Structures are given as C-alpha cells and as structure tokens.
From Swiss-Prot:
Subunit architecture: Monomer.
Keyword Protein transport (UniProt): yes
Annotated function: Participates in the translocation of lipoproteins from the inner membrane to the outer membrane. Only forms a complex with a lipoprotein if the residue after the N-terminal Cys is not an aspartate (The Asp acts as a targeting signal to indicate that the lipoprotein should stay in the inner membrane).
SUPFAM superfamilies referenced in this protein's UniProt entry, alphabetically: Prokaryotic lipoproteins and lipoprotein localization factors
Family: Belongs to the LolA family.
Main location: periplasm
Annotated Gene3D superfamilies: Lipoprotein localisation LolA/LolB/LppX
Signal peptide: 1-21
Protein name (database record): Outer-membrane lipoprotein carrier protein
Subcellular location: Periplasm
UniProt-listed GO biological process terms: lipoprotein localization to outer membrane; lipoprotein transport
Provenance organism: Ectopseudomonas mendocina (strain ymp)
Paired cysteines (S-S): none
Recorded GO CC terms: outer membrane-bounded periplasmic space
Gene: lolA
Length: 208
C-alpha cells in the first residue's frame, strides 16, 4: 500500500512539474512575440457573436499601439467611435452623440485587453494561466484570467509568421468577439499626439 501511495505521489508530482514547465514555455514564447514590437499599427475587422453563433455586431477600423500602455482604437465602420489612452487616462468619443467619456485607465490586463498588446508583458504570468500550441508558421495562445472579476473568461491570441494575426475573447455568457488584424506593421515611427485627445467644442463630457 505504501509503495502504491509513493507511486501515486510521484506521478502527481511529475504531472504538476510538467504542467508548470509547459506554462513557463508558453509564457516565454508569448513574451518573446509581444516584446518584439514597440509599436503596432493595423487595420482591424471585429465580429461579435452570441453563444448560439448569431451575429450581434460587425465593425472595422484602425488601431495604433505604443509601449508602454498607449493605444488608439478608431472604429470607422459602420459608425465612428474613438478610444484613446495616454497610459493614464482613457477617452471614449462618440461623434454621433457628441459625447466624450473620460476615465482612469484600468491597469489590470484582465480588464483592459488592449494592454496585452501595448503594456508591460512581465505582468502576463501574474494575471493569466497560459497554454499554447505551435504548428508551422502559426502559434496560438490561450489565456485564462486568474482574477474572478475579469471582463472575459478566455482570450486567444494568434500569431502567423511572428506577426499578430487575430484575437478572440469569450465572456461569461458565451459571447465571442473575434478581431482580425490586417496590414500589420511593427516598430514603425508613431507620433505621440495620436495618444492624446482634444475635446471637441460643444461635446458633452462625462467624467467617471
């Protein structure tokens, strides 16, 4: 009986060590791919589906990211909307409503997915359980938040030929948001003024 217990403990220890090694390898690989880009600019296409697969929304636009923590997410189809962060504040501008919402940037990666691409990559291991699979030129990472109050249940990041290709977020009710990145450019000069926002005259301002 003692021998069986020892064998079971040994098997369990081996399983835990293997899982830890796999996660360390996944973290190292993801950190490597994210760290290679100090700036990213791309066209994006975003599709949101409910749990049954019914389309809820389709949008498209342009994004610009710069480390550490700067991003500009400009939706131009079907209706314009602009999300800008200078690393401390976030401005959300809706031209149709002539409304600007201002709030402090939530530095938690589980609440601000854009920071996965533009923030401090050293925080990834602290915030997520990470798994990955690699085949040919494609690498897929599955990130599951450790925090219970995360805005999503899981996030998939895919790279093709070391370039960011697409992202998928799944929330607690099964809603899926698929984002495809097109014409991706890395490490090209990006003007800092893109990450500031001047409030248009006459716009309503909501401070949160």
């Amino acid at each position: 009986m003692r021998v069986i217990r020892l064998l079971m403990l040994a098997a369990l220890s081996f399983t835990l060590l293997t899982a830890q090694a796999d996660e360390e390898a996944a973290t190292k690989r993801l950190t490597e791919l994210l760290s290679q880009a100090q700036t990213i600019s791309a066209r994006f296409s975003q599709l949101t589906l409910d749990a049954s697969g019914t389309q809820l929304q389709e949008t498209a636009g342009q994004l610009v990211l710069k480390r550490p923590g700067l991003f500009r997410w400009h939706t131009d189809e079907p209706m314009e909307q602009l999300l800008v962060s200078n690393g401390q504040k976030v401005w959300l501008y809706d031209p149709d409503l002539e409304q600007v919402t201002i709030q402090s940037l939530d530095q938690r990666l589980t609440h601000t997915p854009a920071l996965l691409l533009s923030g401090d990559v050293s925080q990834i291991r602290e915030n997520f359980e990470i798994d990955y699979k690699e085949g040919g030129s494609v690498v897929d990472f599955i990130l599951k938040p450790k925090a219970k109050d995360s805005l999503f249940d899981s996030l998939r990041l895919s790279f093709r030929n070391r370039m960011l290709n697409d992202m998928q977020l799944i929330d607690s009710i099964g809603q899926r948001t698929n984002i495809l990145f097109l014409n991706v450019k890395m490490n090209e000069p990006v003007e800092d003024h893109l990450f500031t926002f001047d409030i248009p005259e006459g716009a309503d301002v909501i401070q949160e």
